[in-house]
């Protein structure tokens, strides 16, 4: 397997392999000879785009295989053709590769094993361990019982092996309508575990499949498919989130009762990623997309990997986030600031600096006549990132928030009658203002001190404030998309009307200016716009004649 390229220069990411209970189990399995190698898998269902929660599973499964010199499969659990699509298959492949991982061989599909799965279902019937049930879905729910009341046996439970084989063949041949028959495992309707009360393992669906076309009209259920796929692929450690803990009983039961090569895989559960204020239900995310509440699955406000990527998150920052939160069996909610901290740390090291003015206010330096070309570092601490040339001209733009006619001593920016330093340039003084008919300031007239380029005033006066600027005659117009949380409540998944719960201020669009050095900003190219935040060129809408930058994260937490 290829080794992930680590961009985030964090000492933490270069520590020895992280310790968690799963790695302790693997260490023991290898030490005792239970397994001689490590084989994991990442098995998403292609019914939506991957989200931040999947990133944790990707980093865990591929990371373990990488660290133990093992292998990790990418397998699509494609057992429900109604909800799945090749679009999702392609996006998942892209996301895994973008995160820095390579899977073993070609991608696998559960549908690759449909013939074998059918054969194992027949084997269970022949052993008297599966039967065709014709209860309606409503009747089946009634017969199933509750957590405090045992279920009841279906009247079809004691059919003969021959009858079940014939009926299952009819199911395969399309002789039953959807919902009129299913194949159930014969386990225990009185089990305290609902998953063991004769679960459905095959159902009828007349739907074309993105891999197998119209070959099948019956499809295996996830719980039946997943464990057998693991065994076929010789997976040693099948890693799932905690909601599948009870399903492990069915996982083991299926494998123990079919003729499949030993040793059998074993399932281990870990806590899923619950990120504060973040929605990870694919069904609800799909609703946001379908109702046009967001700009597709890759909207920068979405918690999808493609959305985070478009917003400006890097593979290294997401890997580092997954490393920091760790792997445990305890469910908890991770603060969103923990994710922001990872991308902020990454971009602080790797993003070149540039100047942007998002809420422009015209400045005219009355005693400055001849334009000057100033050389500025692309990064204050990394000489190897080089320098850039920026034009200083008589007319500039500064941010509206950086000027006041009157202010207290805590305001360290430009005030009428006082001085401030232009970033990497001279000290200027606000002399007078021009206002429009409504009393709004439209221009600040200034003077500059020509002896202050790169040095303090010779007379010893103190000028503490520094503000960014761009030349009004040598800058580029740009659109700035300032993103914040899509939802303001800590648990949006609990909201019934998810559309109504959207934060109306989650996207604010501004029209401003950037220095010319970013004219050819490539898709997803990140910058620190000084004193503004970390931004990246939008991968869909930004182009040389219409620059669009997305706010990735603020410069400081809580800013």
UniProtKB/Swiss-Prot annotation:
A motif ('HIGH' region) lies at residues 44-54. One of its GO terms (biological process) is glutamyl-tRNA aminoacylation. L-glutamine binds at residues 77, 222. GO terms for molecular function: ATP binding; glutamine-tRNA ligase activity. It is found in: Cytoplasm. Belongs to the class-I aminoacyl-tRNA synthetase family. The keyword Heme does not apply. Its EC number is 6.1.1.18. Keywords: Aminoacyl-tRNA synthetase, ATP-binding, Cytoplasm, Ligase, Nucleotide-binding, Protein biosynthesis. It holds the Pfam family tRNA-synt_1c. Monomer. This is Glutamine--tRNA ligase. CDD domains: GlnRS_core. GO terms for cellular component: cytosol. InterPro entries: aa-tRNA-synth_I_CS, Gln-tRNA-synth, Gln/Glu-tRNA_Ligase, Gln_tRNA_ligase_bac, Glu/Gln-tRNA-synth, Glu/Gln-tRNA-synth_Ib_cat-dom, Glu/Gln-tRNA-synth_Ib_codon-bd, Glu_tRNA_lig_a-bdl. NCBIfam families: glnS (TIGR00440), PRK14703.1 (NF011291). ATP binds at residues 45-47, 51-57, 241, 272-273. It is an enzyme of class 6 (ligase). It catalyses: tRNA(Gln) + L-glutamine + ATP = L-glutaminyl-tRNA(Gln) + AMP + diphosphate. A motif ('KMSKS' region) lies at residues 279-283.
